[in-house]
Structures are given as structure tokens and as C-alpha cells.
């Protein structure tokens, strides 16, 4: 089975990587779809985020990374995905993700959204938290892969 894992991944965190690994174990194939959203100012370009993800997932079998614009269900259909994979950190995530899952089903009822709870030690992680800690010079190497930490440090020293 092929799971579509959509997101901005700006930047990719160890929480994302955990979900990708578990998705690979469960479904065999994970298509990581990096959203190109021109109305949102990204920290890293879509191209750089794809490079970061490809580097971080090179040892996880069945992973592929693409860019996408538009609706998640259209991306799933165009790439022959069987399901949509999403992670949940807290109840607040569930409320939002359930709304998105229902919207996706209303647009194309072929796609189920499968939710995986994050590992407890990753439950505080979000890309926004990582960027905020990095902005103030805090330690982030326990939150993101080393090369992403270096990318963020470069941005914050310029």
C-alpha cells in the first residue's frame, strides 16, 4: 500500500521522521508530499525541504518525496496513493485533523485518513517550535537531524 504523507515540513522534525518510519513499516510505501503554498512564507524553499527530507529518509525503505500544490486528495489520486497518513500529537491536533479528513472525504471518498499518534517523547515537537528555539539560539539537535539544525543556525546567524 502507498500512504501519502502531506505537509509543509518546514523544517522536518524527528516527529515527522518517526511517522515516516512507522508508515513505511505499516504500509510499505510512503510518498512524502511537500506543500508549495505561495501564500505562506516558508523558512526553506520547497526544493531545499525536499533535499532535507530525501537526506533524512535515505535509509527508510519505500520513501519518495515530491512537491505538490493544491488539494491533498488530488495529489493522492495523481500519485496512486491508497490512503492519507497524518500524525497526532495532542487532542488539539485531532480536532483540526478530523475536520481536514472529513473535508478530504467530501471531495473524494476514495481516500481514508489514517492517524498515528506520535511517540510521547516527540509530542511537543512542531516545526514552529523548532524555528522559535533556533531563532533564540537554543539547542535543537534533539528535535531535528544535524544537517537541518545547521541549516537553521546558518539562517539565524545572518
UniProtKB/Swiss-Prot annotation:
Any single GO BP term: coenzyme A biosynthetic process
Taxonomic superkingdom: Bacteria
Molecular function GO labels: ATP binding; pantetheine-phosphate adenylyltransferase activity
Catalytic reaction(s) noted: (R)-4'-phosphopantetheine + ATP + H(+) = 3'-dephospho-CoA + diphosphate
Keywords: ATP-binding, Coenzyme A biosynthesis, Cytoplasm, Magnesium, Nucleotide-binding, Nucleotidyltransferase, Transferase
Signal peptide from the UniProt entry: none
Record site feature (Transition state stabilizer), residues: 16
Record's GO cellular component terms: cytoplasm
Pfam families attached to this UniProt entry: CTP_transf_like (PF01467)
Residues holding ATP: 8-9, 16, 87-89, 97, 122-128
Subcellular location: Cytoplasm
Pathway membership: Cofactor biosynthesis; coenzyme A biosynthesis; CoA from (R)-pantothenate: step 4/5
Chain sites annotated for binding substrate: 8, 40, 72, 86
Family from the record: Belongs to the bacterial CoaD family.
Function: Reversibly transfers an adenylyl group from ATP to 4'-phosphopantetheine, yielding dephospho-CoA (dPCoA) and pyrophosphate.
Quaternary structure, from the entry: Homohexamer.
PANTHER family xref list: PHOSPHOPANTETHEINE ADENYLYLTRANSFERASE
Protein name as catalogued: Phosphopantetheine adenylyltransferase
Organism field: Prochlorococcus marinus (strain NATL1A)
Amino acid at each position: 500500500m502507498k500512504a501519502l504523507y502531506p505537509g509543509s515540513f518546514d523544517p522536518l522534525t524527528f516527529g515527522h521522521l518517526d511517522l515516516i518510519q512507522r508508515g513505511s513499516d505499516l504500509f510499505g510505501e510512503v510518498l512524502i508530499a511537500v506543500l508549495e503554498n505561495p501564500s505562506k512564507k516558508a523558512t526553506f524553499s520547497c526544493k531545499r525541504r525536499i533535499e532535507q527530507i530525501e537526506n533524512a529518509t535515505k535509509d527508510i525503505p519505500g520513501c519518495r518525496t515530491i512537491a505538490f500544490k493544491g488539494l491533498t486528495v488530488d495529489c493522492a489520486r495523481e500519485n496512486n496513493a491508497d490512503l492519507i497518513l497524518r500524525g497526532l500529537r495532542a487532542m488539539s491536533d485531532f480536532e483540526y485533523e478530523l475536520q481536514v479528513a472529513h473535508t478530504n472525504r467530501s471531495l473524494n471518498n476514495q481516500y481514508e485518513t489514517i492517524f498515528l499518534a506520535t511517540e510521547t517523547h516527540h509530542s511537543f515537537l512542531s516545526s514552529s517550535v523548532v524555528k522559535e528555539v533556533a531563532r533564540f539560539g537554543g539547542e535543537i539537535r534533539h528535535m531535528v537531524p544535524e544537517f537541518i539544525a545547521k541549516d537553521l543556525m546558518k539562517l539565524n546567524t545572518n
